[in-house]
A protein has these predicted regions:
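Non-catalytic positions within long, well-ordered alpha-helices that form the structural scaffold/packing
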Residues: 16, 20-23
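Short beta-strand segments
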Residues: 30-32, 60-61, 88
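Short Gly/Thr/Asp-enriched flexible loops that form oxyanion-binding sites at enzyme active sites
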Residues: 34-48
Length: 144
């Protein structure tokens, strides 16, 4: 590891926090999906640090773009990383969650961390609207 073996944060989190301190407004994490699943999950959770700081950050690899948001958003099909879209709660129950413009829309659903209902949806309309009233969600744009 690049830092002390007894550290309290992963190297990825240390680097991300440094980027925020240095004023970065956008960060792309490469090499963050390979190898150990525990590190992948820690990297996904670490995206919350950037989200809370107002920094656009994502994990990117050949088939996936993963990011975290705490705000409703609109995704454009023309800018999507791939045809598939999965959404997960990152922290507790997400109230009043809605998906519009997808093959399997949802309307005012309370999204639980254990829900698989929002896995592998697809863009149908030119824009997908994701809305919710609390918490953070993980958005995964994927392709085969």
């Amino acid at each position: 590891a690049a830092s002390d073996v007894y550290k309290r944060q992963t190297d990825t989190e240390i680097a991300l926090r440094l980027g925020i301190t240095l004023g970065s407004k956008e960060m792309i994490l490469l090499g963050a999906t390979g190898g150990r699943i525990d590190h992948l999950w820690a990297n996904v959770q670490t995206l919350s640090v950037a989200c809370d700081a107002g920094v656009n950050a994502c994990i990117l690899d050949e088939k996936n773009k993963i990011w975290v948001t705490n705000k409703s958003c609109v995704l454009k099909k023309s800018e999507a990383y791939g045809p598939y879209l999965s959404v997960f709660s990152l922290e507790g129950e997400i109230y009043d969650f809605s998906l519009e413009g997808t093959k399997w829309p949802l309307n005012h659903h309370d999204l639980m961390p254990c829900d698989s209902l929002t896995v592998s949806n697809q863009f149908v309309d030119d824009e997908v609207k994701i809305s919710f009233v609390n918490g953070r969600i993980v958005i995964m744009e994927t392709k085969d």
